[in-house]
């Protein structure tokens, strides 16, 4: 199997993890990283010994040696424009959630990937947890029988809430529950949603982070 040259745009919390994992992966030949904070760029470069480290993500997009890009930037409003440039540059792309803030932008990115014949996926990490994959296997082989309903509840700590809120106005579904929705739909494929009802509560977090406290969603498949 050919080894890949990978570029990572954004090496903060999640991007830093991906950079370290890529540096240790035998399938990765060259690692290129980009981070707008010089101190963090140096910190991650010291940990990963990349082929190149830059403050400007466009340096990675112009590098013909790079096959694939991972985008892990904040605020989340940066996902769409950087992803668009990446796909237009003909690079394979792993983009952290959310894919974008509007359906129109999401459809455009998918269309660009298809047009340029490149792989494009969202970083839904739950699929790679062994216990989650095991449950899906039991859906597929019939051990669990015909699914009637799926109930998922996700709670996050106050510390994590402070870390991820306030950057962009997004619902709890877009920020966190998207992982659970992806997992449920992965298990239930090829079934598709046909109707959705959702409601959220805004009392505490809205004062400082412009985010809702909780969200309830009912999805008919």
Located regions from the model:
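N-terminal Rossmann-like dinucleotide-binding module
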Residues: 1-48, 72, 184
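A contiguous active-site-proximal alpha/beta segment in oxidoreductase catalytic domains
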Residues: 100-163, 170, 180
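Structural detector of well-ordered beta-strand residues that form the stable sheet scaffold
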Residues: 54, 94, 119-121, 151, ...
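Rossmann-like dinucleotide-binding domain that binds NAD(P)(H)
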Residues: 160-218
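Beta-loop-alpha module in the N-terminal Rossmann-like domain of NAD(P)-dependent dehydrogenases
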Residues: 51-112
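Local beta-strand N-terminus motif with an aromatic residue
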Residues: 30, 50, 66-69, 144-147, ...
């Amino acid at each position: 199997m050919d080894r890949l040259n990978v570029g990572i745009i954004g090496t903060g919390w999640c991007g830093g993890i991906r950079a370290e994992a890529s540096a240790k992966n035998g399938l990765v030949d060259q690692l290129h990283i980009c981070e707008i904070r010089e101190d963090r760029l140096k910190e991650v470069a010291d940990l990963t010994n990349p082929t190149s480290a830059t403050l400007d993500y466009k340096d990675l997009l112009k590098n013909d040696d790079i096959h694939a890009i991972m985008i892990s930037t904040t605020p989340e409003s940066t996902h769409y424009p950087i992803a668009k440039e990446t796909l237009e540059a003909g690079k394979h792309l792993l983009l952290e959630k959310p894919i974008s803030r509007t359906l129109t932008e999401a459809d455009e990115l998918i269309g660009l990937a298809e047009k340029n014949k490149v792989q494009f996926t969202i970083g839904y990490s739950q699929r790679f947890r062994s216990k989650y994959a095991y449950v899906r296997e039991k859906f597929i082989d019939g051990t669990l029988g015909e699914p009637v309903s799926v109930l998922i509840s996700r709670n996050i700590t106050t510390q994590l809430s402070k870390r991820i809120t306030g950057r962009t106005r997004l619902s709890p579904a877009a920020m966190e529950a998207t992982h659970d929705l992806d997992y449920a739909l992965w298990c239930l494929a090829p079934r598709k949603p046909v109707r959705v009802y959702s409601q959220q509560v805004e009392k505490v977090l809205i004062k400082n982070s412009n985010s809702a406290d909780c969200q309830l969603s009912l999805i008919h498949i």
